[in-house]
Amino acid sequence: MKGSPLFHGLAPEEVDLALSYFQRRLYPQGKPIFYQGDLGQALYLVASGKVRLFRTHLGGQERTLALLGPGELFGEMSLLDEGERSASAVAVEDTELLALFREDYLALIRRLPLVAHNLAALLARRLREADLELDLLSFEEARNRVAYALLKLLRQGLGPLFQIRHHELAALAGTSRETVSRVLHALAEEGVVRLGPGTVEVREAALLEEIAFGLA
């Protein structure tokens, strides 16, 4: 816990001082910590146990964002604004948290300004991670669209060997030529297709269909 990135660069006695601003909270297994849409009031540091962060979509489907253990932080945006929580948090097992409320945070950084720098560094790192995740999600979406375009051609009786250029397939899939090239090479490495000069051959039609509908 004292190795948390929030305390990076602090002397041991400064870490103890910082921890004195936190309030202890106990959550039994399965108890919600906060819900998506709640007004944020505190940052939480996991002292023991495990926490699941998840987002609920309009259809009620839950998507797990992270599983957090001792020494990890969540809810940090609430220290910077009074906006709504973007996700829900629940205790996966009996969990002890240390809560840092906004007023206590402001008092803490007056004593230990490095904590504010560490929080900014943590937010920057998470922003980079979010950007990377968006790139990965965009690639997965493009992968599905390219697979669906190939599946349509296959169902039209034009395959399994297609005479098609990357820019033509890009137009069918609604993506860029560069993205199509990346997706096709990934599918070739998986053995789903075989690539040749100006050709794409479907080798695993069943797997292609699963990819097209997001099942693989």
From Swiss-Prot:
Domain HTH crp-type, residue spans: 140-206
Keyword Nucleotide-binding listed: yes
CDD domains (alphabetical): CAP_ED (cd00038)
Example GO BP: positive regulation of gene expression
GO cellular component, one term: cytosol
UniProt keyword annotation of Cytoplasm present: no
Stored InterPro entries: cNMP-bd_CS (IPR018488), cNMP-bd_dom (IPR000595), cNMP-bd_dom_sf (IPR018490), Env_Response_Regulators (IPR050397), HTH_CRP (IPR012318), RmlC-like_jellyroll (IPR014710), WH-like_DNA-bd_sf (IPR036388), WH_DNA-bd_sf (IPR036390)
Record text on subunit structure and interactions: Homodimer.
Name of the protein in question: Cyclic AMP receptor protein
